[in-house]
């Protein structure tokens, strides 16, 4: 069975490695370059009701910005593409494995984690104009999932230790002054105003999402899922959150309010969808799914969907895995 490279922290796995026992529902999905048509409403494999597909596509209301992701062209490299399907660019092409890239608030650079040696992950920032990457950390631990704050001054990230435990940290944009702000968590993302951080943790037993203040105070639980994984995002206006939940090969993206109200399944059932990220205008969500290659470990592609659950589009179509997308300007 073909497999992708995985991280050493078990809680931070974004892709499943066990194959399904039953085939998924058959879906017809348009590519991003195709003329859009309404996407049919499907019955989810959940008690929750998915958003219904009723809106129509308007060219003026199409996706904008860029999406950066891990592409397994050769190993785990970084790629970027415009949200309208143009401008594909491979950012890295070296033996180092790269993961968890995200765009700076102004879209000028990406930060990411690189596996530079056995159990050594460092955080880098690459300028998108020059293509030059700069190492920001040095032997701080297993560092993954970096994200730059909305004001561009700080970076939050996950730090793992040799025992597999993970923590939420924050440092200056240049890598100075790293500080632990929470002792048990992973996959952090900033609130739109930069005063809070959303992250996953099992501090109360099961995996759930929590919010903590920038200074590490007032950690509080947000969700009540049964099989949450971790990767999440906060909408630009602060009104919504997204994450993914479910057992292996049956994961779905869910959208909800910061108080966990108005919960609904966003993705159609049967794709094993995960790793969501909002568009800069808050109208779309990108995610990884296996709709077209269900059951194949290397069958993951990048998709986008409107926040009302309509207009599902495939952004990539490759013989290798594309995953961990993050949307930026």
Task: For every predicted segment, state its role.
Residues 2-4, 17-329:
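Sequence signature of WD/YWTD-type beta-propeller architectures
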Residues 5-9:
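Sec-dependent signal peptide hydrophobic core
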């Amino acid at each position: 069975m073909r497999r992708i490279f995985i991280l050493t922290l078990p809680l931070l796995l974004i892709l499943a490695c066990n194959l399904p026992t039953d085939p998924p529902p058959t879906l017809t999905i348009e590519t991003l370059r195709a003329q859009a048509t309404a996407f049919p409403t499907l019955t989810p494999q959940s008690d929750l009701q998915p958003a219904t597909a009723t809106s129509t596509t308007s060219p003026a209301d199409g996706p904008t910005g860029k999406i950066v992701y891990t592409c397994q062209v050769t190993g785990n490299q970084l790629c970027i593409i415009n949200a309208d399907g143009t401008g594909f660019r491979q950012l890295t092409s070296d033996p180092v494995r790269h993961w968890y890239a995200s765009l700076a608030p102004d879209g000028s650079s990406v930060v990411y984690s690189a596996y530079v040696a056995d159990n050594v992950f460092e955080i880098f920032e690459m300028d998108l104009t020059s293509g030059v990457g700069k190492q920001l950390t040095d032997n701080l631990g297993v560092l993954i999932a970096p994200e730059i704050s909305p004001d561009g001054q700080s970076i939050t990230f996950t730090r793992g230790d040799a025992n597999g435990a993970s923590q939420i940290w924050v440092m200056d944009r240049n890598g100075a002054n790293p500080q632990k702000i929470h002792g048990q968590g992973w996959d952090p993302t900033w609130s739109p105003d930069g005063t809070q951080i959303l992250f996953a943790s099992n501090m109360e037993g099961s995996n759930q999402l929590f919010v903590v203040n920038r200074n590490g105070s007032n950690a509080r639980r947000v969700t009540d899922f049964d099989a949450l994984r971790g990767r999440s995002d906060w909408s630009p206006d602060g009104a919504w959150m997204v994450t993914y939940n479910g057992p292996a090969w049956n994961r779905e993206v869910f959208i909800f309010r910061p108080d966990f109200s108005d919960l609904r399944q966003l993705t159609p059932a049967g794709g094993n969808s995960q790793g969501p990220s909002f568009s800069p205008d808050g109208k779309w969500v990108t995610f990884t799914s296996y709709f077209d290659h269900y059951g194949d470990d290397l069958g993951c592609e990048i998709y986008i969907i409107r926040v009302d659950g309509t207009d599902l589009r495939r952004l990539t179509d490759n013989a290798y895995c594309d995953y961990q997308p993050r949307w930026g300007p």
